[in-house]
Swiss-Prot record:
Key words of the record: Cytoplasm, GTP-binding, Ligase, Magnesium, Metal-binding, Nucleotide-binding, Purine biosynthesis
Primary localization class, coarse: cytoplasm
Gene Ontology CC: one annotated term: cytoplasm
Protein known as: Adenylosuccinate synthetase
UniProt keyword GTP-binding present: yes
Annotated substrate binding sites: A301, T302, T303, G304, R305, K306, R307
Species the sequence originates in: Oleidesulfovibrio alaskensis (strain ATCC BAA-1058 / DSM 17464 / G20)
GO terms assigned for molecular function: adenylosuccinate synthase activity; GTP binding; magnesium ion binding
Family per record: Belongs to the adenylosuccinate synthetase family.
Organism taxonomic ancestry: Bacteria, Pseudomonadati, Thermodesulfobacteriota, Desulfovibrionia, Desulfovibrionales
Annotated binding of Mg(2+), by residue: D13, G40
Chain residues that bind GTP: 12-18, 40-42, 307, 333-335, 415-417
Transmembrane segments: none
């Protein structure tokens, strides 16, 4: 069985949830390896829609084991709400098939308060568009070696001592710098334990579970969140998330050897979207952009914010290919492009008198590039009922083939609608 990484190749919201859901049919274990509840995966099954922020999309398939790896930052309240919501809809979310790494760090109430206080404190121009869910401050504490880990929820004395130590610094920031009220040790401890205690049965050694799966010849899928260009190191810094979103982090964020990863599927939306602030060379503020936004229902699953829309950017995607080494591409939302008379693909950038095949590496460089476009004919056909490659109009097939040529990676899956069965497989 293969061990496959699913990662977003753009700025997130590429449709990873649907692809994970589809490929979960062939895989026994699904692992979330980074990020927190600042990302949302939407999966539509029949007339039911599921939005998942922490729990892997594979939970919707009976008998699959779903793991939350050490690279994730976990909000206990959000996790438990997802558990209850899925249970109410008849999904088995017991600890025999849903497990959390003891090494995963916990988002504490003071992390969320600090996230909001900092963003409010900044002037409008310096804000990065954080979701305010405490992701960044939690990762900060992890790197500072003062964080609370999921395993600490089983040790109330240790948990309380960590809260006491953390609030010495956090309360100084709240009161002296941000003009907020100090937080109480007792209040924070009680809030966390009210839910945290319920998570204890879900705690496990994720590395060991994966190792056992391999011993039984089971395949494992590693589910990423956000997208490549939100990566803390390789994204459009500082307009990025607080974790490594690239495929290579699947190993570190799950506690497994990188040599076991043998397939990387890059999820690419047929156009480009971005939520929040940050450079976006192909952004559109015209009829075509409005078409993508309205037909594609481009609102964030986590924040509800309207997504910015633009033409497909293959210069940006070349960087994703270089960083992730994908074996194949799953192209999503191709149906949204129906009705556009012509399509444009950014094939390079003009920057400081040079033509670049990849984004400039200096900070703010991407904000000053000029996209170089190729124009292709569009199509009017409704492709949502397409079942085979031949069912697609010639213009759509040509669009896909040009993407393959520009990136040097085959497109193996094509999504033509939100439903599970609205997917073409080109294997």
């Amino acid at each position: 069985m293969s061990n496959v990484v699913i990662m977003g190749a753009q700025w997130g919201d590429e449709g990873k949830g649907k692809i994970v859901d589809l490929l979960s049919r062939e895989i026994d274990v699904i692992v979330r390896f980074q990020g927190g509840n600042n990302a949302g995966h939407t999966v539509i099954v029949g007339d039911k829609s599921y939005i998942l922020h922490l729990i892997p999309s594979g939970i919707l398939h009976e008998g699959k084991t779903c793991l939350i790896g050490n690279g994730v930052v976990l909000d206990p309240v959000v996790f438990w709400k997802e558990v209850e919501a899925l249970a109410e809809r008849g999904i088995d979310v017991g600890p025999q098939r849903l497990m959390i790494s003891r090494k995963a760090h916990v988002i504490m109430p003071y992390h969320k308060a600090l996230d909001v206080a900092r963003e409010d404190f900044k002037n409008k121009e310096s804000r990065i568009g954080t979701t305010g869910r405490g992701i960044g401050p939690c990762y900060e504490d992890k790197m500072s070696r003062i964080g609370v880990r999921a395993g600490d929820l089983a040790d109330p004395a240790l948990l309380r001592s960590k809260i006491e130590a953390a609030l010495v610094e956090k309360n100084a920031l709240f009161t002296a710098l941000y003009g907020r009220e100090a937080m109480s040790v007792d209040a924070v401890f009680d809030e966390v334990m009210a839910v945290g205690g319920r998570l204890v049965p879900y705690l496990t050694d994720v590395s060991s579970v994966i190792e056992d799966a391999w011993a039984n010849d089971s395949g494992v899928m590693f589910e990423g969140a956000q997208g490549t260009h939100l990566d803390i190191d390789h994204g459009t810094y500082p307009f990025v998330t607080s974790s490594n979103t690239v495929a290579g982090n699947a190993a570190a964020g799950s506690g497994i050897p990188a040599s076991r990863l043998d397939r990387v599927v890059a999820i690419v939306k047929a156009y480009t979207t971005r939520v929040g602030a940050g450079p976006f060379p192909t952004e559109l503020d015209d009829e075509a952009g409005n078409h993508m936004q309205s037909v594609g229902h481009e609102f964030g699953a986590t924040t509800g914010r309207k997504r910015r829309c633009g033409w497909l950017d293959c210069a940006l995607l070349r960087e994703s290919v270089r960083l992730n080494g994908p074996t194949d591409i799953a192209l999503t939302k191709l149906d949204v492009m129906s009705g556009l008379k012509e399509l444009k693909i950014c094939v390079a950038y003009e920057y400081n008198g040079q033509r670049l095949q990849h984004p400039p590496q200096e900070q703010n460089g991407l904000a000053h590039v000029t996209p170089v476009y190729e124009t292709m004919p569009g199509w009017d056909d409704d492709i949502t009922a397409a079942k085979t490659w031949e069912d697609l109009p010639e213009a759509a097939r040509n669009y896909i083939c040009r993407i393959e040529e520009l990136l040097g990676v085959p497109v193996s899956m094509i999504s033509v609608g939100p439903e599970r069965d609205q997917t073409l497989n080109r294997k």
